UniProtKB/Swiss-Prot annotation:
Enzyme class at the top of the EC tree: ligase
GO CC, any one term: cytoplasm
Annotated HAMAP family: MurC
Gene3D superfamilies given in the database record: Mur ligase, C-terminal domain, Mur-like, catalytic domain, NAD(P)-binding Rossmann-like Domain
Protein name: UDP-N-acetylmuramate--L-alanine ligase
Functional note: Cell wall formation.
EC numbers on record: 6.3.2.8
Main location: cytoplasm
Alphabetical UniProt keywords: ATP-binding, Cell cycle, Cell division, Cell shape, Cell wall biogenesis/degradation, Cytoplasm, Ligase, Nucleotide-binding, Peptidoglycan synthesis
Subcellular location as annotated: Cytoplasm
Organism of origin: Synechococcus sp. (strain WH7803)
PANTHER family cross-referenced by the UniProt entry: UDP-N-ACETYLMURAMATE--L-ALANINE LIGASE, UDP-N-ACETYLMURAMATE--L-ALANINE LIGASE-RELATED
Length: 486
């Protein structure tokens, strides 16, 4: 491995507004590791903020104009201010920064600058980009490449979403939600799939396709998923991968066995069989993500044998079928699924564990209970029927209130309406609706059974279900999770 340590030509301090966010904290961590003077604020000192504070960041527990006065006293005046799309124009700290005429960067500007510093793999797509980015990072790490990584989830091999590596490559997750990924000029762009989402930003599917085409055009080379009909029709890629065919694609992994705790597949390069692989994670979607990741590493010149030998070490990133623990015989799992296709794929994987009797969990579950928190009113309105169909595969569905993510309420758009559509589609469907998170916890307690898999899905605060259950347990029966392969 050739060492290549890259530093940005930034002499000023850097201040992150909303530093605790998953994308912002990764960037802050990398700048800290590379010796930059970093400060950051958020509404509370979350675990991410505490971790950054331990790493040397000056941390503020509020987003207030007074933070800049405090930085003046610390001789950190006139910082470059970094924001994400989640920070509104009326944010008091951002207003103060502009009144001071400070330089304000969007987080994508900073990530684009990092990408420009060294050969980079930027991974985009509607679904699977965090998992694919994590697998690329894990395989490169195992192969001795020590990549820099900027990921939208916790990468198990680093226990972090940001890692300042010494190797030649940078791996970045390219978020399409606000269109800012068109700024990236990566050595290799990867697109996992494409489906309409983020209707608060995109007019329609054509608008989303055009944005991803601009991303692809900005990359020196493009790798894409041949199995995705939108990609195969609308994109010109330098290389393609598939889990459905081995002919006329550059990389393929054809499933031999899809089991509840693992996936076995035949691996092909340029149509030639090169060996059989076993992944310690279930699901056809995870196989596709892994084949895409293997293809990206191969296109960057990493020997195949160095990659295959580390497949057994793969783990999904945090909040991707993340086993949290056992509560009175119920196995609690957290997943970030918040689009109908993601919900369907996650439930299919969970149902396979129930039906096959094989599972990466401590015990094979006997029944699936889906706990779903819709994310954003706009997404729930756009995909209400699709969400309802996807959720029907669970024996029991518990719905949390919609997580607004800053959006205003929309008349008639709520979890009760989603439940009504589910019952219109299937009169036999068992679905219950909670009006608060506390009521959701009560529903789980009352209606779940020992040996159930309780699968909490959503991009909001439904991931607090495990902690709420364990804190409310008066019998002290909650137990910490053991290490899992997936």
């Amino acid at each position: 491995m050739r060492s290549l340590v890259c530093t940005l030509d930034i002499q000023s301090p850097v201040h992150f507004i909303g530093a605790g966010g998953i994308g912002m904290s990764a960037l802050a961590r990398i700048l800290l590791s590379r010796g930059h003077r970093v400060s950051g604020s958020d509404r509370r000192l979350s675990p991410a903020m505490e971790s950054l504070k331990t790493a040397g960041m000056v941390a503020f527990e509020s987003q207030a104009a007074a933070n800049f006065q405090a930085l003046d006293r610390l001789d950190r005046s006139s910082p470059i201010v970094v924001i994400s799309s989640a920070i509104p124009d009326h944010n008091p700290e951002l207003v103060a920064a502009r009144e001071r005429q400070l330089e304000v960067w969007h987080r994508s500007d900073l990530l684009a600058a990092l990408i420009d510093q060294q050969p980079s793999i930027a991974i985009a797509g509607s679904h699977g980009k965090t998992t694919t980015s994590t697998v690329v990072t894990t395989l490169l790490h195992g192969a001795g490449e020590d990549p820099t990584a900027v990921i939208g989830g916790i990468v198990p091999c680093y226990d972090s979403n940001g890692h300042a590596g010494q190797g030649r490559l940078l791996v970045a997750e390219a978020d399409e939600s606000d269109g800012s990924l068109v700024k990236f000029r990566a050595s290799l762009g990867v697109i996992t799939n494409l489906e309409l989402d983020h209707t608060d930003h995109y007019r329609d599917l054509d608008d989303l396709i055009a944005t991803l085409q601009r991303f692809g055009d900005g990359c020196k080379r493009l790798l894409a998923n041949q199995d995705d009909p939108i990609l195969s029709e609308h994109f010109q890629a330098d290389a393609w991968w598939s889990v459905q065919r081995s002919d006329n694609v550059d990389f393929a992994g054809l499933p031999v066995a899809l089991e509840g705790d693992r996936t076995i597949a035949d691996l092909y390069e340029q149509g030639t069989f090169v060996g059989q692989i076993t992944l310690p994670m279930p699901g056809l979607h995870n196989l596709s993500n892994t084949i895409g990741a293997l293809a990206a590493c191969r296109m960057e010149g990493v020997p195949l044998e160095h990659l295959i030998s580390h497949l057994s070490e793969l783990k999904t990133p945090g909040r991707r079928f993340d086993y949290r623990g056992d509560w009175q015989g119920r196995q609690i799992v957290d997943d970030y699924a918040h689009h109908p296709s993601e919900v369907a794929a996650t439930l299919n994987m969970a149902n396979l564990m129930v039906s096959s009797g094989r599972s990466p969990l401590p015990r094979s579950p006997q029944r699936l209970v889906a706990v779903f928190q819709p994310h954003r009113y706009s997404r729930t309105q756009e995909f209400q029927t699709e969400f309802a169909r996807a959720l029907l595969s669970a024996e029991l569905v518990l719905l949390a209130p919609i997580f607004a993510a800053g959006e205003a309420e929309m008349p008639g758009v709520n979890s009760e309406a989603l439940a009504s559509v589910m019952q219109e589609l299937s009169t036999q469907q068992s679905v219950l609706v909670a009006s608060t998170m506390d009521e959701l916890v009560s529903l789980v307690k009352e209606h779940s059974l020992p040996d159930d898999l309780v699968l909490a899905m959503g991009a909001g605060d439904v991931n607090s279900l495990w902690s709420r259950l364990s804190q409310s347990s008066s019998e002290g029966q909650a137990s910490c999770p053991p290490a899992l392969a997936a």
